[in-house]
């Protein structure tokens, strides 16, 4: 064999090994996410649905749970996609010739983007509708009962739904797109209609993020306040615990010995009072066990961090609005070749990349908080060991829509300059200046409005509680104080 043949063979072997390595890394990453999501979903599922007398229903619920786990793993992968790409680029810039990070390259990142796009389409269009119809199916009339009969009914329903959605997408593309070829190429499902459908879903997800994120940014302050110990400057914890124990003992004694009172007792009301007093006592004990640093510095530092992150995100969006008016390069666009390790995507280098990653995670958490805080989706909020299977399916679909729109959301707002890879950059509406500009302006305006309305009221209330002014007998506006009433009677 000649020398050129050896060179060709070595190149082919290298490409083969790189491909196998990328497959192994992708499989390990997905397996890790799948295990984490399975553990997470088992904490919220309703155990009665999986331990029923009917083995058929339990089998159906187990299959639906595995499909939900797969979808949630893809959603978590979509959340980690953009931060992982930004960090990988900075690592390759810092250590360009390190032997131990040769597996980290542009081909791997580009492949992960394509896999997330593919499996997001698969989950939204096929797996989640299949899981819902599968749990609701009972088999065709006259057919034998069993899992196979349910599968037949589910497949038929899914085919009808696919035809309906495909027809709607074809009509929408024919109306919105003036290209005659798009109306005649109905057979071109994979190259045109599936990305077009996902583009519409992603656009709805970006609009949902526009509504939920400002609401979540405002709610993050109150949610953090419930998780941390708030400082109280003028309080005696021992006295409050002593009083709380006496208040709890009175209704408890009435419940244990109802015959001691000659008046009829409302036992349900007494139980609610005991539960409320026990909750109050647990909070007081938590405050007593907390250290002085945790009581006095933890909550203010957390509020300061939230305020800095929120203000920084609004500032970046405002700067991006000005860049849109000046430079056309600020528009979000797709990138076909993932050339990583050549230039930093932040003006501040690695420090700026860390800030970008922190802002992306912060906005994603805020959007989830805002989503479950909104009145429209509050009923979807999962409960510990008490979440129905259909509710789990709905949560997985909503989280996948939000997470798959996160890369487009972050690039549209200018939080990062990392261009969208693969099919994420093929969305037609990303090239519309008016949509991108109005989206940035709406986000900045809604976030500022929610912060001004919510944060100022929350700070005022917390300052009043911190100084103990809420326990003072202050007069209510519109009514004279008690002393003046006594003087009037005299």
From Swiss-Prot:
Q: Where is this region: LCN1-binding?
A: 1-76
Gene Ontology biological process terms from the UniProt entry: hematopoietic stem cell differentiation; negative regulation of canonical Wnt signaling pathway; receptor-mediated endocytosis; T cell apoptotic process; T cell differentiation; T cell proliferation; Wnt signaling pathway
Q: Does the keyword Transmembrane helix apply?
A: yes
**Keywords on this record?**
Cell membrane, Endocytosis, Endoplasmic reticulum, Membrane, Receptor, Transmembrane, Transmembrane helix, Wnt signaling pathway
Query: GO molecular function terms here?
Result: transmembrane signaling receptor activity
Question: Domain of life of the organism in this record?
Answer: Eukaryota
Cytoplasmic-facing ranges: 43-66, 136-154, 218-305, 372-388, 453-490
Q: Which Pfam families match?
A: LMBR1 (PF04791)
Give a GO cellular-component term.
plasma membrane
Q: Which InterPro entries match?
A: LIMR, LMBR1-like_membr_prot
Where is it localised?
A: Cell membrane; Endoplasmic reticulum membrane
Q: Where are the transmembrane segments?
A: 22-42, 67-87, 115-135, 155-175, 197-217, 306-326, 351-371, 389-409, 432-452
Q: Which residues lie on this side of the membrane: Extracellular?
A: 1-21, 88-114, 176-196, 327-350, 410-431
Q: Where is this region: Interaction with LGB?
A: 1-59
This protein's membrane topology, according to the annotation, is: Multi-pass membrane protein
Family (UniProt): Belongs to the LIMR family.
Whom does it interact with, and what assembly results?
Answer: Dimer. Can also form higher oligomers. Interacts with LCN1; this interaction mediates the endocytosis of LCN1. Interacts with UBAC2, FAF2, VCP, AMFR, ZNRF3, CTNNB1, LRP6, GSK3A, GSK3B, FZD6, DVL2 and RNF43. Interaction with LGB and SCGB1A1 is controversial.
Q: What does this protein do?
A: Plays an essential role in lymphocyte development by negatively regulating the canonical Wnt signaling pathway. In association with UBAC2 and E3 ubiquitin-protein ligase AMFR, promotes the ubiquitin-mediated degradation of CTNNB1 and Wnt receptors FZD6 and LRP6. LMBR1L stabilizes the beta-catenin destruction complex that is required for regulating CTNNB1 levels. Acts as a LCN1 receptor and can mediate its endocytosis.
Q: What is this protein identified as?
A: Protein LMBR1L
What is the organism field in this record?
A: Pongo abelii (Sumatran orangutan)
